[in-house]
Amino acid sequence: MAMYKVDPPVVPINQPTSTTCWYACLQMLFIWKKKDPSKIIPLMDQSPDLFPYYMLENGIAPSECKPTAKALGLGYAGDGDTYPDVLTNALKSHGPYWVAGMWKKNHSHVIVVTGCNPDLGTITYINPWCNFDLSESKADVDWLNARGDVWKQTLGSMMYWI
């Protein structure tokens, strides 16, 4: 089987500050679903468990992922490893995935997974940090799964449309 990519393609967005990768990636999901991304912060602000204006300045914590997904009407997963065939089927069923992790020591980050080749175990993703040419990157599922124990134990560290 060849690389499966979500359709329509995700429109890449650059994050404006070092703490807003989570927000830029949510915006990409909203735009992909043809929903108004300006509603993200107001919807989150309605939750007693979230402080989105603080989060814009400080990033998203693992404990804020599940409440964020719930506030925005997103599905959530992420506690454990994923597998190429499972990820491919998830992309086919739900579209792009918001994924939080710590791929560099002491630097949590969020990306949007846009494609997967189940035979090769490779993915395509959008990294919103300093992505000046607004391109997709490539990696393998093992890289995706090496996102740090804290994030891999966080239900909600992967979000998607239901």
List each language-model region with its residue ranges.
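Conserved active-site-adjacent core of cysteine acyl-enzyme catalytic domains
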Residues: 5-6, 44-162
